[in-house]
Amino acid sequence: MPYALIFAAALHVLAAVFWAGSTFALARSGGAALERLFKPQLAAAVLAFATGGYLGHTLHAHAFGRGEQVLLAAIAASAAALVVQLAVVGRAVRALRDGAGDEAGPRALATAAHRVAAVLLALAAIGMATARYLPPAPVGTADAAAVSGSAGVQ
């Protein structure tokens, strides 16, 4: 395995573990370190998407079988988690930073958003961890034809 793939895989796992782990912690803690973790979470999410994009392009560019379909669903779940965190948690962080008076409202909103994002990130992790173990499509099905056609096999 080339060193670039090893490095990208390690960065991808580390960034995703930090992003998901801090999201799970914030979902359970009521947003105790919300303001301090928001930017590092976004940086980890961007790094996870960048390295995942490289890995996907390098390892799965010529196939769209069951494994790749599960990976696509996992990517969609993690993208939805990022959108929830950007939109809802970002708004709560701005409200807390601007001193909008009552801190309980923005913290409760951010906690709920982190709970939604945590579920989505858990689904993404399950999909990415299991995608490689799915059996290939049976020969003669439309799924198998799509995979062999995309790989250039006749």
Model-derived regions, located:
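Polytopic transmembrane helical bundles with strong interfacial aromatic enrichment
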Residues: 1-154
